[in-house]
């Protein structure tokens, strides 16, 4: 199973799309978490596109819903571990997404350097996309 990060969904929903998700992961293996849903849908200005994206995201299996206190605390631990290791993790939300992925033993498919840093200090299974 693969948790697809916001950085990938942005490229999928972009018009014209810069990538096809199916080239990188079987759609039946895709899951999400609510922080990804929020990040994806909050970026839409057009109401019709927002509605389509919202329906698409909420049709996916959702892990860690509702998110429990220990997920947030683990995310904080990841952020702090990165700082101790001299790594810059720019987004606390990425730590939250990574914490959820680690807890459920999911790969994270992304185009975001934060996950590369988190993978260096944790058991995160990071799968970075290369966009052309």
Short names for language-model regions:
Residues 19, 62-109:
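Active-site neighborhoods of divalent-metal-dependent phosphate/nucleic-acid chemistry enzymes
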Residues 1-35, 42-55:
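Short, well-structured N-terminal submotif of metal-dependent ribonuclease cores
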Residues 48-68:
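Active-site-proximal, substrate-binding regions of enzyme catalytic domains
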Residues 5, 94, 112-114:
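Acidic active-site catalytic centers that drive phospho-/nucleotidyl reactions
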Residues 5-6, 40, 75, 101:
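Generic structural signal for small/hydrophobic residues in well-ordered secondary structure
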Residues 102-132:
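Acidic, PIN/NYN-like endoribonuclease modules and their adjacent C-terminal/linker elements
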Residues 4-5, 33, 90-91, 128-132:
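Histidine- and aromatic-rich ligand-binding microenvironments
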